[in-house]
């Protein structure tokens, strides 16, 4: 009975520490209105499969991997797509910012899926390169290559230039 209480306490601790991160990920990737369900399903799957986890890496990366699979399953079931970026940037801002945001969304959509997901996990979720690799089922080096290639493609697609007009 003591071992079971230990596992329950560990699961509760992980939920407390990582629920907000998992929910944020699910809000971006789950079909509309299903983010909370996806987050709950993520933790349910984690609890069911926790014997396979064995603290091999950071729990957050493992949970994001599960969330990614849950959201993909839900999207297939509902034939939905990713949530769109908001049309306007909160707080107003320069009207050109909206154009920039649309251009960025279009450029991101043209990237291969693995590169797009790597960028979102790294810069949107704040995962390390190693955690990105773990979440996507690739090595740290493959994740770094995917990130580098994605950034290079975005720079070329968006014609990014520095303050002196040189291509970056």
Each model region followed by its residue ranges:
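Structural recognition of an alpha-helix C-terminal capping motif at a helix-to-coil junction
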Residues: 37-44, 57-69
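C-terminal flanking helix
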Residues: 23, 43, 112, 116, ...
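DNA-recognition helix of helix-turn-helix
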Residues: 68, 72, 130, 136-162, ...
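Acidic, proline/glycine-rich intrinsically disordered inter-domain spacer in sigma factors
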Residues: 9, 80, 85-109
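A short pre-motif secondary-structure segment
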Residues: 118-122
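Short, charged helix-capping/linker segments at alpha-helix termini
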Residues: 2-13, 23-41, 51-54, 140
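Arg/Lys-rich amphipathic alpha helix in sigma70-family domain 2
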Residues: 48-55, 64-85, 97, 160
């Amino acid at each position: 009975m003591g071992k079971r209480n230990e596992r329950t306490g560990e699961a509760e601790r992980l939920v407390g520490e990582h629920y907000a991160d998992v929910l944020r990920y699910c809000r971006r990737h789950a079909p509309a209105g299903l983010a909370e369900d996806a987050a709950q399903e993520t933790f349910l799957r984690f609890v069911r499969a926790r014997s396979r986890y064995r603290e091999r890496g950071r729990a957050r990366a493992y949970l994001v991997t599960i969330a990614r699979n849950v959201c993909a399953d839900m999207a297939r079931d509902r034939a939905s797509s990713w949530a769109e970026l908001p049309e306007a940037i909160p707080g107003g801002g320069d009207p050109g910012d909206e154009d920039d945001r649309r251009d960025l969304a279009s450029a991101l959509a043209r990237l291969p899926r693995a590169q797009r997901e790597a960028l979102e996990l790294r810069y949107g979720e704040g995962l390390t390169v190693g955690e990105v690799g773990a979440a996507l089922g690739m090595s740290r080096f493959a994740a770094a290559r995917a990130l580098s290639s994605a950034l290079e493609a975005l720079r070329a697609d968006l014609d990014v230039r520095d303050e002196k007009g040189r291509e970056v």
